[in-house]
């Protein structure tokens, strides 16, 4: 009986140890680079992203570069009505002004939801999804205007 409890305990602990949102990010604000390869080693990096300036909310996500653009993606249930909390993806849809920290630098960017089927499909297929599932929310970062 004890041997059956260990896998359940491990799963429970793993689920409880998810990313914990934080508040405002600190660091030097810099203009967005001409090419994200100037600041990201390879094609991906862990980024800290702050949104909702009136009530700052920050999280860590894997950012990735594709065709020169910087992206992030949600899990496939981020906007599901049954999801127990308001996901960062829902927050960004309402408040797209973000601050992205990579290393010590902060870039003030706009998180643009990618809904065009061709771009969304190509980016998520390059991430290994075959077929590309519904529900994943994809954002491309753009300079603020």
Per-region residue spans from a language model:
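Short beta-strand segments
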Residues: 43-80
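Short, surface-exposed loop and linker segments with low hydrophobicity and enrichment for Pro/Ser/Thr
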Residues: 39-41, 66, 132-134
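Short, structured beta-strand-loop surface elements
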Residues: 56-58, 77-145
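C-terminal motif of bacterial Sec signal peptides marking the signal peptidase cleavage site
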Residues: 13-16
């Amino acid at each position: 009986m004890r041997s059956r409890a260990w896998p359940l305990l491990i799963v429970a602990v793993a689920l409880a140890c998810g990313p914990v949102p934080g508040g405002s990010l600190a660091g030097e604000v810099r203009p967005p680079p001409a090419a994200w390869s100037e600041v990201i080693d390879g094609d991906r990096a862990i980024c800290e992203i702050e949104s909702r300036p009136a009530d700052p909310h920050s999280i860590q996500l894997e950012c990735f570069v594709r065709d020169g653009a910087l992206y992030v993606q949600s899990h496939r249930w981020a906007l599901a009505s049954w999801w127990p909390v308001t996901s960062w993806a829902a927050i960004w849809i309402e408040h797209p002004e973000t601050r992205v920290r990579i290393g010590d630098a902060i870039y003030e960017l706009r998180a643009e939801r990618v809904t065009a089927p061709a771009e969304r499909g190509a980016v998520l297929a390059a991430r290994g999804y075959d077929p590309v599932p519904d529900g994943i929310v994809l954002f491309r970062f753009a300079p603020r205007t």
